[in-house]
């Protein structure tokens, strides 16, 4: 995994920016990782070792994409980054700007989640960027993990920790394809965590 991430994200030049080269590199590194898993845990078998290696590598790739977004640069990392942080700050407009400004009408849940760091004063810009990255990652991975645990409780063929982690990783990758925004996962998270047919009031 480390070799793959180095060649894709750290190696100078554009050798592995071409999709075909990147696919071959991914397949080769996944095959080596699958072999290591199979030799270390023969009970997994070739199929599970291969799937687990590919899922792990893909999840790490998706995680690594977020690292440049935790930047200390004062310049905007995207055309709407500044407005998103400003909209988030409006939930605390009186303490920040001395006036009671209206809260955002568009995507209020997103900006409410992003506003949490504004509870603390004088946090640097990189912390707000880190917080947004954590929202992306935790919402997607928590959704996958809760889904896997729910299926396991309902008697699905998810015996052991490895299948649960594999399903959680696959769900994380699936949700990040779009990606599905973290504020849209709040309700699925509540449903996956809270709904239990044998606990009426909690449900």
Residue ranges and their predicted role:
Residues 9-15, 129, 162-185:
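Aromatic- and kink-enriched transmembrane "portal" helix at the membrane-lumen/periplasm boundary
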Residues 61-89, 94, 98-114, 123:
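Extracytoplasmic catalytic/substrate-binding loops of multi-pass membrane glycan-assembly enzymes
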């Amino acid at each position: 995994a480390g070799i793959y991430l180095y060649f894709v994200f750290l190696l100078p030049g554009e050798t592995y920016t071409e999709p075909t080269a990147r696919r071959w590199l991914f397949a080769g590194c996944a095959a080596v990782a699958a072999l290591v898993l199979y030799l270390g845990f023969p009970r997994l078998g070739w199929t599970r070792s291969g799937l687990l290696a590919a899922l792990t590598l893909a999840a790490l790739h998706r995680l690594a994409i977020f690292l440049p977004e935790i930047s200390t640069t004062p310049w905007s990392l995207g055309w709407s980054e500044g407005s998103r942080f400003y909209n988030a700050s409006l939930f605390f407009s009186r303490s920040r700007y001395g006036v009671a400004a209206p809260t955002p009408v568009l995507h209020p849940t997103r900006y409410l989640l992003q506003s949490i760091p504004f509870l603390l004063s004088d946090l640097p810009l990189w912390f707000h960027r880190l917080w947004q990255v954590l929202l992306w990652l935790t919402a997607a991975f928590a959704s996958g993990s809760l889904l896997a645990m729910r299926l396991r409780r309902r008697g699905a063929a998810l015996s052991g920790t490895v299948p649960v982690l594999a399903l959680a990783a696959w769900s994380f990758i699936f949700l990040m394809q779009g990606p599905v925004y973290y504020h849209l996962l709040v309700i699925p998270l509540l449903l996956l965590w809270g709904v239990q047919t044998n606990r009426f009031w909690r449900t």
